[in-house]
From Swiss-Prot:
GO terms for molecular function: acyltransferase activity. It comes from the Bacteria. It comes from Bacillus subtilis (strain 168). This is Stage V sporulation protein AD. Keywords: Sporulation. Gene3D superfamilies: Stage V sporulation protein AD. GO terms for biological process: sporulation resulting in formation of a cellular spore. The keyword NADP does not apply. The gene is spoVAD. InterPro entries: SpoVAD, SpoVAD_sf, Thiolase-like. GO terms for cellular component: plasma membrane; spore wall.
């Protein structure tokens, strides 16, 4: 791996996604991508006795599917990189307890999907792991209880709010050739433009996404024309227009090349306010829908920029603003991009 420009890692060895697993809840199952998820549930408890245990079940499902697709067992994995939204990364920690794989716990809020993939790819490229597993998850009810109001409270929300995706995604990464190659990653910087409203994460995260996309273009001397798709994680209906406006004003227009996972996972009639959000939003959309399009040749090169609001309820109560970050990874159809 070599650092190119200021923030972009270009992998010196071919790094591949060997398999991916996704698990999702009932609302995600009923959405436009529902048929693409490997495992789905008809109710939010996922056959468990608490929301937190349900989220844990989702991550275990995604991990198990990713391993099974590649005819692997947990003993074939050298390193697990995982994280979630809950305090102390409790979902990832308990899944790691069960798997007993060497474990790096990671937190980047909703940017964790691409953060884990980027670091896993770097470690595989550097020879520190032959085969790594990257996973993340979120659950609507656990996130609401921790960051906003418990679902039982019935608090009203503004139109700028998003709906946290209930689901999990996991990928196996190695130098073993596969259909999808990971060629580079751009590590984001923390941005904070003074947003304090926990019900408007799209506006808060858009500047971080724009900053990472601009830096990626600068570092690799590229433009949006070099990509079939530039996909943000969960800016949804509020943040997506903002990031396009920022990039256009700064001379890096993305136009119709841009889309957002939070706009793809649900339909407007599903009562999701501005769209989807959460760690699982970018993970389940990318690891199912986007990977399928890459394998089928409908896409050749995609830049996935997972966006995260580093939101702390404690700091918000102390009148602090919300810092945000975005990490990006380039996925290419093996042999398909020039």
């Amino acid at each position: 791996m070599k650092l190119t420009g200021k923030q972009t890692w270009v992998f010196e060895h071919p790094i591949f996604v060997n398999s991916a697993g996704t698990a999702a809840g009932p609302k995600e199952k009923d959405g436009p991508l529902g048929s693409l998820f490997d495992k789905t549930y008809d109710e939010m408890h996922c056959n468990q006795k608490s929301w937190e245990m349900a989220e844990r079940q989702l991550m275990e499902d995604a991990v198990n599917v990713a391993l099974q697709k590649n005819n692997l067992t947990k003993d074939d994995i050298d390193l697990l990189l995982a994280g979630d939204l809950l305090n102390q990364n409790v979902t990832a920690n308990y899944v790691a307890r069960h798997l007993k794989i060497p474990f790096l716990c990671m937190f980047g809020a909703c940017s964790t999907s691409m953060e884990t993939v980027a670091v896993a790819s770097a470690l595989v490229d550097g020879g520190f792991a032959k085969r790594a597993l990257a996973a993340t998850s979120s659950h609507n009810a656990t996130a609401e209880r921790q960051f906003r109001y418990p679902t039982e409270y019935g608090g009203q929300k503004p139109d700028t709010a998003t709906s946290t995706v209930t689901g999990s995604g996991a990928v196996v990464i190695s130098q073993t050739p596969g259909d999808i190659q990971i060629t580079s990653a751009t590590v984001g910087k923390v941005s904070d433009l003074g947003i304090t409203d926990p019900f408007d994460m799209g506006s808060a995260m858009a500047p971080a996404a724009a900053d990472t996309i601009k830096q990626h273009f600068k570092d690799l001397n590229r433009t949006a024309d070099d990509y079939d798709l530039i996909l943000t994680g969960d800016l949804s209906g509020v943040g997506s227009p903002i990031v396009k406006d920022i990039l256009k004003e700064d001379g890096y227009p993305v136009g119709t090349k841009h889309d957002d996972c939070g706009l793809l996972i649900y339909t407007p009639d599903q009562q999701v306010f501005a769209g989807g959000s959460g760690c699982a939003c970018s993970a389940v959309v990318t690891y199912s829908h986007i990977f399928k399009q890459l394998r089928e040749g409908k896409l050749n090169r995609v830049f996935v920029v997972a966006t995260g609001a580093l939101l702390s309820p404690t700091m918000i109560q102390q009148k602090e603003t919300i810092p945000t970050i975005a990490h990006g990874v380039v996925f290419e159809r093996a042999g398909g991009a020039s």
